[in-house]
Amino acid sequence: MDIRIIYSIQDAVGKTIKELGYKFEEINEDIIDFRYEKGDVIVVFSRHESSSKIPSLTVHYPGNPIDKTMGGEPKKLGIAFPSLLTSIYREIRKINIDIEKAIEATHHGPTYQHIPIIFVEIGSSKEYWENKELVKTLIEATLRGIDKYKDIECENKIVGFGGTHYTPYFSLLAEKSCVGHIISKYYLAELSNEVILQTVNNTIEKIDTVMFDNVNSKIREKIVNLLATYKLNFKFR
């Protein structure tokens, strides 16, 4: 598997990576709207921004679940790679630093590529984006996750609906299951049939379980009925 690791020189974390001397591939494009597509998989290091400014280390897939976009195309999800994302996340969880660690729900672009993209991010302010020791620690954990992904335990390969953006429930499930796309509660009311199908189709590993985190019965029924022919397990919380 040809896994390409990239950063953008337009991105604050990318600039720190360059200063550290890592020989990853450098792009000069918007980190949420790039067109780069080489290898079999792309792992992207970038900054994470949030209004709360809470320090964090996060992983997620790109995708715009509804018409509103942040780079990429509307109603388009990227390609998921559950065992690789989960392997990276499990190594990040081992970092002995008091900082939030989470799998984020699917959001922002790019969505143009036909291969999996996984974002590995540092949040949520300049203080952390430019912290060379923290950036180095995150890179080393990510590289360990890449090395181990073929051997990790995956009781199930799941997609998730509901919960908040930082997905505490699905992040917890990643201790034993491998995680594909997660659609947070904020998008569910506007979610099209097409995007629901993409959650299980846009992946290079077969999904076997759909998890719901406090989703109302009407939306839950819509999703279950639409995915009924896929022979999936449905679990509710």
From Swiss-Prot:
**Catalytic activity from the UniProt record:** a D-aminoacyl-tRNA + H2O = a tRNA + a D-alpha-amino acid + H(+); glycyl-tRNA(Ala) + H2O = tRNA(Ala) + glycine + H(+)
Under SUPFAM superfamilies, the record lists: AF0625-like
Q: Which Gene3D superfamilies match?
A: AF0625-like (3.40.630.50)
The annotation note on the cofactor reads:
Binds 2 Zn(2+) ions per subunit.
> Which InterPro entries does this UniProt record tie to the protein?
Deacylase_DtdA_archaea, DtdA
A GO biological process this protein is involved in? D-amino acid catabolic process
Q: What is its EC number?
A: 3.1.1.96
User: What cofactors does the UniProt entry give for this protein?
Assistant: Zn(2+)
Q: Keywords for this entry?
A: Hydrolase, Metal-binding, Zinc
- State the superkingdom: Archaea
Listed Pfam families: tRNA_deacylase
A GO molecular function assigned to this protein is:
zinc ion binding
The protein's role, per its UniProt record: D-aminoacyl-tRNA deacylase with broad substrate specificity. By recycling D-aminoacyl-tRNA to D-amino acids and free tRNA molecules, this enzyme counteracts the toxicity associated with the formation of D-aminoacyl-tRNA entities in vivo.
User: Subunit structure, briefly?
Assistant: Monomer.
Task: Tell me which family the UniProt entry assigns to this protein.
Answer: Belongs to the DtdA deacylase family.
Q: What's the protein called, per UniProt?
A: D-aminoacyl-tRNA deacylase
Species whose genome carries this gene: Sulfurisphaera tokodaii (strain DSM 16993 / JCM 10545 / NBRC 100140 / 7)
The organism's taxonomic lineage, starting at the top: Archaea, Thermoproteota, Thermoprotei, Sulfolobales, Sulfolobaceae
